[in-house]
Amino acid sequence: MTVSLGFTTGQIVQEFYVDDDSDETLREAVEKSTGEKLVDDEYGDVVDGAIVWWRSDDAEEEDLADLLVDAMSNLDDGGLIWVLIPKPGRPGAVPVADVEEAAKVAGLHTTSAASVGPEWAGIRLTARSRNR
């Protein structure tokens, strides 16, 4: 079971912390819905959305709030950020409250949460408009 993340045809989606445990079916579904390949964290142009694969071990290398700020740096107004975390009880699981706190620190709003695959849950975030 893979759900739509809300990305549409022609959108460019940037991916952070993709690894061997990332859900390939979900990644392929995003590419199919946009008609574009996912771009990596080195991509330097404007993007329409971002996917952050986040596990408890990742917190040892980087702060999630800092990573979310990095993800916003290329994000077009109205763009979505999805933070994907292992479901509770899975290796690398992260409390949803940790993601919500990091989002708040980064100036983002949590809009929804969903099961996005057999092993992953997603928290959808939106940025404040740059025009405010």
Task: Go through each PLM region and give its residues.
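S-adenosyl-L-methionine-dependent methyltransferase catalytic core, i.e., the SAM/SAH-binding region
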Residues: M1-R132
